[in-house]
């Protein structure tokens, strides 16, 4: 049984905790850390497996009862919490983004690489779940067969029902970041450029939030992306992709079906 400690009991931290309880039989949440003791108490009561809690994340990370750590703290705390988690020598799952500035992202990425090279195995993963989705795995397989010819461009849709607490920056670092990651993985390629545009703001979005967001990106191979990101989408969650190749197209439809 893997004993998990979670840093942060907000939307993402509580979501991970509930998922572990309901869907991961060989893991259990034993420790929680947050500055909000009320949230800790509520989540502890809901889970029924928590052995201890603390407002000090370092204390949780170094506790011998914890085998693995989930970092779901506010974005600006990811870098310091990653450093503490690395020092603990335990397996780590960190929510995206890795950092809130490019300088910090490069610095902590280098530290992670050095750490994993030293221990000789992968110790840190980030919250990019689409790589494990059977539909995306099938699209990756179909692209790799070459049966559809070389990809030329692709369209993406990432629309959330209601992203409570979303910020204009957060549309990139918390929502669109899933697109930036999954297409590097699907095409085994790296981004060359990404541009963003803002259409007319939705009246459903909170004041001050630039929503929706239009993205145009280009991978180093020349494959080009056109996508949209919506934080407050009235008709429900909607996540789709269409890859246009020289001999056909591959789609993940509204209902999670792969269409060719």
Regions found by a protein language model. Name each.
Residues 50-51, 88-90, 115-122, 223:
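A short helix->loop->beta-strand "cap" motif at the edges of active sites that frequently abuts
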Residues 16, 49-111:
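Beta-loop-alpha module in the N-terminal Rossmann-like domain of NAD(P)-dependent dehydrogenases
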Residues 27-31, 67-69, 170:
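Short active-site oxyanion
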Residues 99-163:
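A contiguous active-site-proximal alpha/beta segment in oxidoreductase catalytic domains
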Residues 129, 241-260:
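C-terminal glycine/acidic-rich active-site capping loop/insertion
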Residues 71, 94, 100, 124-126, ...:
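Hydrophobic residues in well-ordered beta-strands that form the structural core
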Residues 1-47:
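N-terminal Rossmann-like dinucleotide-binding module
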Residues 161-224, 229-238:
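Rossmann-like dinucleotide-binding domain that binds NAD(P)(H)
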